[in-house]
Structures are given as structure tokens and as C-alpha cells.
């Protein structure tokens, strides 16, 4: 009878069940939405389809490695290493809550290809930057994507923070964007002044998305913010390769040109 009970507990505590618990816990603790989105994407798309239904206490190093190798086979070495870290977080949470004996991801040290660190591609020539800004003005995709592209080089904030901008965070009177402390993992809200151009773009967006939570909502996923891929695809559509410019690179552009 005790053996049957233990077996039932194992079945109920699969990797995906424990993973969902951990995501909910992180959300309660105030983890940044962009961090939760990345974690959930890795779990839902890269890990749970292969090890999700296995009792968390029975996940073996080999099973986890096979799931990670699938990611590597697509050339996504950085994603594979990130997925290993996420799996480790789930397994350590399982250990801490008495549902597993150890974190088997530790056994995979050195098993994955180490992703080569690359700097975000950025335009640092003023004339080339001007050409990019003109190209953005001529973008004829969805208004949400175009507006996000327009404000990114003007705000000097991380793309994830911009995509998760909420109407409740915009102070029209003081002309600023107040990012809550929990989003930034800081003790105080992060204040971003809004220049005239940004305010005009936000005014245009207000008539389109004011009824929702996000300033730049996804057209496909109701109630969700614009995806990172949406902005990336827009830059590719404008004729800029990943080696020329990325949405993350705008901060490097700002640092370089302001220093000069």
C-alpha cells in the first residue's frame, strides 16, 4: 500500500507539474515579466514536450541531455545552455520541496557546446543610423511593431522592457514612464523621461490599444505583449541582417554616439 501511494505521488509530481509551480512561485515573488516569459517559453517549447510527463524524481541525466541535444541540433547553443539552467532550477525546487533527491543537471557539466559570446550588433555611424530611422518610418507592418521600433532608439531601454510597457506606467502630466521596481529587480521604480517624439507616438497608439494593458500588444496573442520575434522580423523585413543591427543594439548605439 505504501509503495502504491509513493507511485501515485510520483505520477502526480511530473516535471511539468513542478515546473508550473515554480513559474507561479516566481510570479508571486515579483519576477520581471520578460524573465517569466523566457522561462515559460523554454519549458513549454523545449523541455516539457520531451521530459514534461516524467515524474520529476525519475528524470535521468540521459533523458535531460537528449532534450537538450534536440535544441543543439538546431544550432541553438545558447538556448540549450539556458534550458539546462532552467531545468536545474525546476529540479532544485523539486529537491527543496521533497519531491526529488537531487538535481541531475549537475551531471551534464561540460556536455553541451559552450555558446560563443557575441556582442549585440549595433549601428554606430550617424549617417547609417539616419538611414535606419528613415527605414523605420517607412515600415508598413502592424502599427504596434512600427511604434515599438520608433521608440526603441529614443528611450535607451532594453527591448524587453519596452515591449512590456503598460499604459498604467505612463505619467502624461510629468511626461515620464515609471517602470515598477519589481519589473527592474530594483528597490525603487525606474523613471524614464519621455521626449516629445515618444509622447506623440504614444498618443497615436492610445487610440489603438488604450483599452488593453500593454502599449504594444501582440496582434496574434490577445492580452499579451509584442513578442521579441516580431521586432526582430521587422528589422529583417527592412533589409537589416542580424549582423548589422538588433533591437538590443540600440543601447550600444546610444552609448557610442553620446560618448562622441
Regions found by a protein language model. Give the residues of each.
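Basic, Lys/Arg- and aromatic-enriched nucleic-acid-binding interface segment
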Residues: 29, 71-88, 96-165, 173, ...
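Short, surface-exposed polybasic/aromatic micro-patch for ligand or macromolecular engagement
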Residues: 1
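Hydrophobic recognition helices of helix-based DNA-binding modules
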Residues: 47, 90-94, 202-205, 258
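Basic/aromatic-enriched alpha-helical hairpins
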Residues: 5-74, 90-93
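Conserved hydrophobic/aromatic pocket- or pore-lining residues that grip, position, or stack substrates
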Residues: 36, 47, 64, 87-90, ...
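Hydrophobic (often cysteine-bearing) scaffold residues that line and stabilize catalytic clefts
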Residues: 11, 15, 19, 32-35, ...
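Short, basic (Lys/Arg/His-rich) helix/loop patches that form interaction surfaces
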Residues: 134-146, 155, 192, 206-220, ...
Amino acid at each position: 500500500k505504501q509503495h502504491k501511494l509513493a507511485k501515485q505521488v510520483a505520477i502526480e509530481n511530473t516535471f511539468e507539474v513542478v515546473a508550473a509551480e515554480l513559474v507561479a512561485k516566481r510570479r508571486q515573488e515579483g519576477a520581471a515579466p520578460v524573465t517569466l516569459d523566457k522561462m515559460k517559453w523554454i519549458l513549454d517549447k523545449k523541455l516539457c514536450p520531451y521530459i514534461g510527463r516524467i515524474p520529476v524524481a525519475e528524470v535521468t541525466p540521459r533523458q535531460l541531455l537528449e532534450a537538450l541535444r534536440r535544441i543543439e541540433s538546431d544550432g541553438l547553443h545558447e538556448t540549450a545552455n539556458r534550458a539546462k539552467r532552467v531545468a536545474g532550477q525546476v529540479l532544485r525546487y523539486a529537491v527543496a520541496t521533497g519531491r526529488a533527491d537531487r538535481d541531475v543537471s549537475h551531471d551534464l557539466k561540460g556536455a553541451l557546446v559552450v555558446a560563443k559570446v557575441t556582442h549585440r550588433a549595433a549601428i554606430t555611424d550617424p549617417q547609417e543610423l539616419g538611414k535606419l530611422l528613415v527605414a523605420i518610418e517607412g515600415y508598413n507592418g502592424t502599427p504596434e511593431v512600427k511604434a515599438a521600433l520608433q521608440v526603441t532608439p529614443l528611450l535607451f531601454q532594453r527591448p524587453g522592457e519596452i515591449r512590456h510597457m503598460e499604459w498604467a506606467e505612463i505619467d502624461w502630466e510629468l511626461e515620464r514612464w515609471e517602470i515598477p521596481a519589481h519589473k527592474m529587480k530594483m528597490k525603487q521604480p525606474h523613471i524614464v523621461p519621455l521626449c516629445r517624439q515618444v509622447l506623440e507616438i504614444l498618443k497615436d497608439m492610445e487610440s489603438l490599444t488604450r483599452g488593453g494593458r500593454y502599449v504594444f500588444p501582440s496582434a496574434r496573442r490577445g492580452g499579451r505583449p509584442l513578442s521579441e520575434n516580431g521586432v526582430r522580423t521587422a528589422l529583417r523585413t527592412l533589409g537589416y541582417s542580424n549582423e548589422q543591427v538588433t533591437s538590443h543594439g540600440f543601447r550600444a548605439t546610444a552609448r557610442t554616439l553620446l560618448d562622441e
